[in-house]
From Swiss-Prot:
Organism: Herminiimonas arsenicoxydans
Keyword Cell membrane: yes
Any single biological process term in GO: positive regulation of translation
Binding site for GTP: D14, H15, G16, K17, S18, T19, N131, K132, I133, D134
Main location: membrane
Membrane-related topology note: Peripheral membrane protein
Phylogenetic lineage: Bacteria, Pseudomonadati, Pseudomonadota, Betaproteobacteria, Burkholderiales
EC number(s) from the headed UniProt entry: 3.6.5.n1
Protein name: Elongation factor 4
Keyword terms: Cell inner membrane, Cell membrane, GTP-binding, Hydrolase, Membrane, Nucleotide-binding, Protein biosynthesis
Subcellular location(s) per record: Cell inner membrane
Keyword Acetylation (UniProt): no
Pfam families: EFG_C, GTP_EFTU, GTP_EFTU_D2, LepA_C
């Protein structure tokens, strides 16, 4: 066991995490040059394309060190994005060490800091590595100073390497072996194994990626999952070197996979503890929690006959994405669809994109909303994740909205514009500190404001230099109202939005004027109104198309013209009573892209 090292790589998007992993795998001979491809561990097309890691992957490698010993290195790849922070914390708790990869030309960024603090909290040894030192604008001393300033770990002997050229990668592994402690654990104790990740394979069912903490596991033994309590027979176990290799046993300190014929991912939750049914462990490993969706949106098929296909696609995605929640929903305007819960905006985009790309779906998405807690007049509490479910204002005692703590990191020249943005989004400043060139701002902000377009705005005000991460803090009473859109005095449920009262008139007017541009002219006048309860806050009219009925009267008597005009007017009035307005699909999307001028 002394020659095992379990480690993961912490890095901001684009600081070269996956490339470094590729180099390490190549150096250890995990794959022949023929099988080597860019970003071996990012197996989803979407992961490669966006350059992000969504699911954790592993590689068990053997490395002959300079001291002549052969070490087993287990690399556990972690996602780097805020939305997947729970998956990161599970990956990190399976390790004893982490390589903190920092781009020598850019310095420390928000996600790195968030994940690094998480690693330090879990007691993981952090080894700083400066990557991309081959770039002409690389500045290693400044980057080291920044690591010490912002994160507060000693970076004087940080390893310098370039994952692209392969320079210094061996030094990284040597530093890893020297600094990271071997795993602790007792191979003879009752089995405890942490599920780091699990995914669904079409041939064998659920594959669980586990870190064995104590005990030993062999095939044909019965295992019990502690959170869900299900008992299954182990069919095969092994390691990924990055291709899978079966083994006769897995013992304490090792990272490998278990296949036990589990049919659904719900049974094998990330963070759960695996133990033997015959000789169970006394208690589960700490840190397991159920993942709660934070952001909700409705997904509707463009063609009504695709509803079943959409349900099947969501089911298949759910097999590989335990954080995705969905339930059927009916909207008068959009027909049948699903209300889906996501971890955050990136997660939502990825799910949408995978549905469109892997399953050929055409989707309409309603505006993302967060979960509000509503206290009713009789004291009962309900959770509202959909504007159309919001009760009548007269029955509501108070509405509480989710507040998050946002950590923002940016170069100091952008502080002013970022603060202005945060104030516009109803943020309350909690803290501000300078670290070298970088500034860290801490704000409390309503989740609803972040969900809308905060991230894009942040990137544009700071020219892409600012980075952020956020975590849920609490529910707080707030003056939010539901704005309904009426078209010819009929409510359209899919257009309802929940906004803060101070912003409601503005948003109502904005949506109404956007709708006016998008609803085609009819043969009768169409009135578009935004209302809060019974108060109408804004109105736009789409003028009717009309035939020139006076074209055939040359000169002639005014009463004749009047008669024709009155007749036309009566006809239009009658049409307005029976006619219905078709709302084009773009109109629903317009609610999403509300650009604040």
């Amino acid at each position: 066991m002394n020659n095992i090292r379990n480690f993961s790589i912490i890095a901001h998007i684009d600081h070269g995490k996956s490339t470094l992993a590729d180099r390490i795998i190549q150096l250890c001979g995990g794959l022949s040059d023929r099988e080597m491809e860019a970003q071996v561990l990012d197996s989803m097309d979407l992961e490669r394309e966006r350059g992000i890691t969504i699911k954790a992957q592993t590689a068990a490698l053997t490395y002959k060190a300079r001291d002549g010993q052969v070490y087993n290195l287990n690399l556990i790849d972690t996602p780097g994005h805020v939305d997947f922070s729970y998956e990161v914390s599970r990956s990190l708790s399976a390790c004893e060490g982490a390589l903190l990869v920092v781009d020598a030309s850019q310095g420390v960024e928000a996600q790195t800091v968030a994940n690094c603090y998480m690693a330090l909290d879990l007691g993981v040894e952090v080894v700083p590595v400066l990557n991309k030192i081959d770039l002409p604008n690389a500045d290693p001393p400044a980057a080291m100073a920044e690591i010490e300033d912002v994160i507060g770990i000693d970076a004087t002997d940080a390893v310098q390497c370039s994952a692209k050229t392969g320079l210094g990668v061996a030094d990284v592994l040597e530093a890893l072996i020297a600094k990271v402690p071997p795993p602790k654990g007792d191979p003879d104790a009752p089995l405890q194994a942490l599920i780091v990740d699990s995914w669904f394979d079409n041939y064998v069912g659920v594959v669980m990626l586990v870190r064995v903490v104590n005990g030993t596991l062999k095939p044909k033994e019965k295992i019990r999952l502690m959170a869900s309590g299900s008992v299954n027979l182990v069919e095969s176990i092994g390691i990924f070197a990055p291709r899978s290799v079966s083994l006769p046993s897995l013992s304490a300190g090792q990272v490998g996979f278990i296949i036990a014929g589990i049919k659904e991912l719900k049974a094998a939750k990330v963070g759960d503890t695996v133990t033997l049914a015959s000789r169970p462990a006394a208690e589960a490993l700490p840190g397991f929690k159920e993942v709660q969706p934070q952001v909700f949106a409705g997904l509707f098929p463009v063609e009504a006959n695709q509803y079943d296909a959409l349900r099947d696609s969501l089911e298949k995605l759910k097999l590989n994405d335990a954080a995705l929640m969905y339930e059927p929903e009916v909207s008068q305007a959009l027909g049948f669809g699903f209300r889906c819960g996501f971890l955050g905006l990136l997660h939502m985009e990825i799910v949408q994109e995978r549905l469109e790309r892997e399953f050929d779906m055409d989707l309409i998405t309603t505006a993302p909303t967060v979960v509000y807690e509503v206290i009713m007049g009789d004291g009962s509490l309900i959770k509202v994740d959909n504007p159309s479910k919001m009760p009548e204002p007269s029955k509501i005692e108070e509405i509480r909205e989710p507040i998050v703590t946002v950590n923002l990191y940016m170069p100091q020249e952008y502080v002013g514009s970022v603060i202005t943005l945060c104030i516009a989004k109803r943020g309350i400043q909690m803290d501000m500190s300078y670290h070298g060139r970088q500034v860290k701002l801490v704000y409390e902000m309503p989740m609803a404001e972040i969900v809308l377009d905060f991230f894009d705005k942040l990137k544009s005000t700071s020219r892409g230099y600012a980075s952020m991460d956020y975590e849920f803090k609490e529910y707080r009473a707030s003056d939010v109202v539901k704005v309904d859109m009426l078209i010819n005095s009929e409510k359209v449920d899919a257009l309802a939005i929940i906004v803060h009262r101070s912003n409601s008139q503005y948003r109502g007017r904005q949506v109404a004027s956007k709708m006016r541009e998008l609803i085609p002219r009819q043969m009768f006048d169409v009135a578009i109104q935004a209302t809060i309860g019974a108060n109408i806050i804004s109105r736009e009219n789409v003028k009717a198309l009309r035939k020139n009925v006076l074209a055939k009267c040359y000169g002639g008597d005014i009463s004749r013209k009047k008669k024709l005009l009155e007749k036309q007017k009566a006809g239009k009035k009658r049409m307005k009573q029976v006619g219905s307005v078709e709302i084009p699909q773009e109109a629903f999307l317009a609610i999403l892209q509300v650009d604040d001028k």
